[in-house]
Amino acid sequence: MNKHIVLALGLLSLPTFASQSDFSWHGYVSQGLTQSKGSRAITDNNSITGELTEIGLNGYYQIAENISIAGQVNYLDGGNRFEQGARLDYLFVDWKLPDLPGDWQGQIHAGRFKNRHWLYSVARDVPHTRYTSVLPQSVYFDGFRDAALGSNGIQTSFSHFSANNIWELNWSYGRSNINDSQRDFLLGDEANGSIKQDFVHQASVFWQPATMTWKLGASWLNSDFRYTPSQDDNRVAGKANIERFVVSGQYFAENWEVSAELIREFQDSKGLFFPDFETK
């Protein structure tokens, strides 16, 4: 029988400090214990391990009334789920747009931004904003987390609040760097070349009643990848296109909530494994 046990030992959230009224920073520390018996989930053996560490430090600087800079660095150790170490989580310029027609509000993020198109993508690396140490792998697959979490490019977000409805519209276009562990997730351990994400194009819409007891959403993703083999490689040059549709829903009660995301994904690949390989 496969057993997987996760124990969260504690969470420390550091208070916000401000040396000036236009600058603030804070951080968090999370440490857990895990044990996997008869499986390779998180760990590769049956031992109890502390390979569930998350440390983050973020800051915010107000440049002007409607322009600011926000950034976060974090250290992650998730066992065998993803590459251990420090990474730049996000660093972007936030421009709050002037009042728009119809009482809409808007903002633009330029730089490395967080993915706003799925329920838990924005706060994926903030332990106290989610309810489990390991998110559902059908949507938030850990092996590809760094590329799915955010992108380098531009993102727009528009919101509208009325007496009966709350609307949110998001659009983004950019790309992410693909490290070796993510390359191995896509092409296997025998791949020795380099893989590049040409672009990732995303859009989403969310609706809530004014009571905020429900949240319904839909999102779309389209992305291209190219692989360049090394001189001594078991893979060949090729490319892949991924298109994903997600429908989501949440219900919020006073002391509990229910979340669901339904995903449909299409992949079109050419080359990669051998010259005539093609799949749709």
Q: What positions do the PLM features span?
A:
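Outer membrane beta-barrel
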Residues: D22-W25, N46-S176, F206-A210
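Detector for outer-membrane/organellar transmembrane beta-barrel domains
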Residues: Q20-S24, G32, F206-K280
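Sequence/structural signature of outer-membrane beta-barrel proteins
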Residues: G32-A41, N74-N80, L100, N115-H117, ...
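Internal alpha/beta core interface subdomains
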Residues: N170-S172, N179-F206
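Outer-membrane beta-barrel biogenesis signature
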Residues: I5-L12, T16-N46, N115, L119
